[in-house]
């Protein structure tokens, strides 16, 4: 029996009445290399005095280098991109992206989704969303969600890098996402949010 995989997830979004989008990225690595990937993430953070590696705090050269190094690691990245995302609708968009993400990850052998922790009530919303999404899975499916602060789990940083690269691509900076092309599956979904 195969060991269920863990996906590490983070998000990025752009609110806009017409062109808004929500990116939910999940990074999945073979369990045997989790420690290796953690070390890579710590190395990418370098000597910067930050608690975690974060796409938006890197310059373009660092972003491209990070994407290149992440692409060299065995694993895959599932991304759901929801549109539209008008102002104050990002939580609804997140739920739509997360629902689809659960189904896709389960089909790839993932049984545990570890997401970056947010406020307690927002974490509860994620748990409720996953509980609802499980109805689309086989009755015997074992799929659970947990939350952790990114400062405690560098594997979440990999998902931040993927989400950032996809967001940047949508905003016209194509190189980082192109480097991840061979290990990334991106699915576009309608958030059902309509326009503001």
Language-model-detected regions and their locations in the chain:
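Phosphate-ester processing/binding pockets and catalytic centers
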Residues: 1-196
């Amino acid at each position: 029996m195969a060991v269920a995989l863990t996906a590490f997830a983070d998000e990025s979004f752009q609110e806009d009445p017409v062109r808004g989008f929500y990116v939910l990225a999940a990074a999945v690595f073979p369990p045997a290399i989790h420690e290796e990937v953690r070390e890579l993430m710590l190395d990418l953070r370098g000597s910067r005095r930050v608690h975690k590696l974060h796409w938006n705090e890197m310059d373009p050269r660092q972003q491209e280098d990070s994407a290149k190094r992440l692409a060299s690691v065995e694993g895959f990245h599932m991304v759901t991109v929801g549109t539209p995302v008008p102002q104050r609708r990002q939580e609804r968009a997140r739920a739509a992206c997360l629902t689809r993400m659960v189904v896709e990850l389960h089909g790839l052998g993932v049984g545990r989704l570890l997401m970056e922790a947010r406020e307690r009530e927002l974490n509860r919303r994620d748990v409720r969303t996953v509980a609802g999404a499980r109805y689309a899975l086989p009755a015997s499916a074992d799929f659970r969600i947990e939350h952790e602060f990114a400062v405690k789990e560098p594997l979440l940083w990999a998902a931040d890098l993927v989400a950032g690269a996809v967001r940047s691509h949508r905003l016209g900076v194509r190189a980082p996402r192109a480097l991840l092309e061979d290990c990334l599956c991106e699915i576009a979904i309608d958030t059902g949010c309509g326009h503001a």
